[in-house]
């Protein structure tokens, strides 16, 4: 077998290839069928609405009934109790290839001083035995033609820092830890070596599970990973599926039974599929843990350990994380062997220095007026294609703010855990494409949602800690761009003042004198249970809870502003 599988990938042709991209979890005719959408309100906002006449958001085989929390149960710690622990005998397991890297002559010719300078210039540190030198161009990475054609078609000028160092590491077959900020290009860092890995393995037989398994903390991130793998794997006819909770299992089960080379999954739904015999992990030889710190934050460690116990121990494992806390280090030491590590940027959690941070000390009653003033300034140039992500502390406040903004004529939509999956997908699409350039979100969106060109983040409510603050504002200023983060800080947040000032000082940002005063004099209050505006439901809000598509996202938009 050649190092890149030779003609292996071409023989993957036949058999139907990739059947339908990530959309195939939909069906026909379901979706959101109401006639609400944006059709009202003086011409409204983009006729047709959400579902309904004129297409709207595509089908869904009867719709996605259960909404968030249905079916998947990703947080149930007793998941996996029925999984049998595997006793692996490596002598009897089929052999497989995982080392494909051949150093390019240009890379081999560079002196250690040149390598060290490149790493310094890109804020890159490495650790471990025999770490390969970074590559500086796509051609130096040594990917086969069928991969490079896809990369060049995307128009990327050069590898990002994490790709420069991560590609040689992953292609070498070694276990890898990569620490880099969200938006650094890490998805491609493991996706492209995964495609090479798959094409060097025997074709799937009936009943085989996937060859590559990617675990992700949220369904939004899982879907985005799937989009990248679909894009770059199509020339190899690599099939994939995305397995996550909150939607019916039928389409996911059908994909798994037909056979997929790549499975992208959230931990809970994957265990559900394993326990029910819908798939197995016996063929997995390339395992990816994406946003490992976030998965541990969300309480998935027991599920991750159960899943890894179902995978042969001589697999290749790649772990990616934005931070490197002791919990992630423990997971790496338990499941990675002689791993090599690359860190981009400081190992300490710090804010992106390309982001201008504006922190305003306000009263709760001032928040809405101040938000509107900021929006007026940001959106006054309609040609600027600004995108604004507004974070709230609760789902209730997210819906109230969205309702308020839409009534005031702003193109705003909300996303949070109580929204049904197809509505969340639709909202994300509207935001990504700029059709609705304002998105209101809870922390479900603070990691894992990869929307490019977000120009502004507005923290309507301050989060529970400075780490979440850094991750929230990190949605802007990505891929070398600049961004602005505006934060409303109240006396209820005073316990967080010292940490916030530390973040601002490290990034050399202006500090509101009232914020500095909170640090000097301490201050009580703690965290308010509800971070948002109290008692102002906004005109026309009948009833106190979001009704999904009949809630704030379905309200006709006033035509006063937009």
From Swiss-Prot:
It catalyses: ATP + H2O = ADP + phosphate + H(+). GO terms for cellular component: cytoplasm; nucleus. One of its GO terms (biological process) is nuclear-transcribed mRNA catabolic process, nonsense-mediated decay. Residues 370-519 form the Helicase C-terminal domain. It is an enzyme of class 3 (hydrolase). Residues 167-342 form the Helicase ATP-binding domain. SMART domains: DEXDc (SM00487), HELICc (SM00490). InterPro entries: DEAD/DEAH_box_helicase_dom, Helicase_ATP-bd, Helicase_C-like, P-loop_NTPase, RNA-helicase_DEAD-box_CS, RNA_helicase_DEAD_Q_motif. The Q motif is unique to and characteristic of the DEAD box family of RNA helicases and controls ATP binding and hydrolysis. This is ATP-dependent RNA helicase DBP2.
């Amino acid at each position: 077998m050649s190092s890149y599988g030779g003609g292996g990938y071409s023989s993957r042709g036949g058999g139907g290839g990739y059947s339908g991209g990530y959309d195939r979890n939909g069906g026909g005719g379901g979706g959101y069928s109401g006639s609400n959408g944006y059709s009202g309100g003086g011409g409204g906002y983009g006729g047709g609405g959400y579902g309904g006449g004129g297409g709207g958001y595509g089908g869904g085989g009867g719709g996605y009934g259960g909404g968030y929390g249905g079916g998947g149960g990703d947080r149930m710690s007793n998941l996996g109790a029925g999984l049998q622990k595997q006793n692996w005998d490596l002598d009897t397991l089929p052999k497989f290839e995982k080392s494909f890297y051949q150093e390019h002559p240009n890379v081999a010719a560079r002196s250690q001083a040149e390598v060290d300078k490149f790493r310094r210039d890109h804020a890159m540190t490495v650790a471990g035995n025999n770490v390969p030198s970074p590559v500086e161009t796509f051609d130096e990475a040594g990917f086969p033609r069928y991969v490079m054609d896809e990369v060049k078609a995307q128009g990327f000028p050069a590898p990002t820092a994490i790709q420069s160092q991560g590609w040689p590491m992953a292609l070498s077959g070694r276990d890898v830890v990569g620490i880099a900020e969200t938006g650094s290009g890490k998805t491609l860092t493991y996706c492209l070596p995964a495609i090479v890995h798959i094409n060097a393995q025997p074709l799937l037989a009936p009943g085989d599970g996937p060859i590559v398994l990617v675990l992700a903390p949220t369904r939004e991130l899982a879907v985005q990973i799937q989009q990248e793998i679909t894009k770059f794997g199509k020339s190899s006819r690599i099939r994939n599926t995305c397995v996550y909770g909150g939607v019916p299992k039928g389409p996911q089960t059908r994909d798994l039974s037909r056979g997929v080379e790549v499975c992208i999954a959230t931990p809970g739904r994957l265990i559900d599929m394993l326990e029910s015999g819908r798939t197995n992990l016996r063929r997995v030889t390339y395992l990816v843990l994406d946003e490992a710190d976030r998965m541990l934050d969300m309480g998935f460690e027991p599920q991750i350990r159960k899943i890894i116990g179902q995978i042969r121990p001589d697999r290749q494992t790649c772990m990616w994380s934005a931070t490197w806390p002791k919990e992630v280090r423990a997971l790496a030491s338990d499941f990675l062997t002689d791993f090599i590590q690359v860190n981009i940027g400081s190992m300490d959690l710090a804010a992106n220095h390309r982001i201008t941070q504006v922190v305003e000390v306000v009263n709760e009653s001032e928040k809405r007026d101040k938000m509107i003033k900021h929006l007026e300034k940001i959106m006054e140039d309609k040609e600027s294609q600004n995108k604004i992500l507004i974070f709230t502390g609760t789902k209730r406040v997210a819906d109230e703010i969205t309702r308020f903004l839409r009534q005031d004529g702003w193109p705003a939509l909300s996303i949070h855990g109580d929204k049904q999956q197809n509505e969340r997908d639709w909202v994300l699409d509207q935001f990504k494409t700029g059709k609705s350039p304002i998105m209101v979100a809870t922390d479900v969106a603070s990691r894992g949602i990869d929307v490019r060109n977000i120009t502004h983040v507005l923290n309507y409510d301050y989060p529970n800690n400075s780490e979440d603050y850094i991750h929230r504002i990190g949605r802007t200023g990505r891929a070398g761009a600049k961004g602005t983060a505006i934060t409303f800080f109240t006396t209820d947040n005073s316990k967080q003042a010292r940490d916030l000032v530390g973040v601002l000082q490290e990034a050399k940002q202006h500090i509101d004198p009232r914020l500095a005063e909170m640090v000097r004099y301490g201050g009580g209050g703690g965290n308010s249970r509800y971070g948002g505006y109290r008692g102002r439901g906004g005109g026309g809000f009948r009833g106190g809870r979001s009704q999904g598509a009949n809630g704030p996202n379905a309200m006709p938009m006033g035509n006063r502003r937009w």
